[in-house]
Swiss-Prot record:
InterPro entries: Ribosomal_bL36, Ribosomal_bL36_sp
An annotated GO cellular component: ribosome
One GO molecular-function entry: structural constituent of ribosome
Swiss-Prot/TrEMBL keywords: Ribonucleoprotein, Ribosomal protein
Any GO BP: translation
PROSITE patterns listed in its UniProt record: RIBOSOMAL_L36
Gene behind this protein: rpmJ
Annotated family: Belongs to the bacterial ribosomal protein bL36 family.
Pfam entry (one): Ribosomal_L36
Annotated protein name in UniProt: Large ribosomal subunit protein bL36
Length: 38
């Protein structure tokens, strides 16, 4: 899980979602693409 000021999709499988006011990226194909904004 990367914590970044700005989260971006890194591949076409990445999805940007918002959980409890926190913007996150989840990726089914590449778990290393997981990010959260903070």
């Amino acid at each position: 899980m990367k914590v970044r000021a700005s989260v971006k999709k890194l591949c076409r499988n990445c999805k940007i979602i918002r959980r409890d006011g926190v913007v996150r990226v989840i990726c089914s194909a590449e778990p290393r693409h997981k990010q959260r904004q903070g």
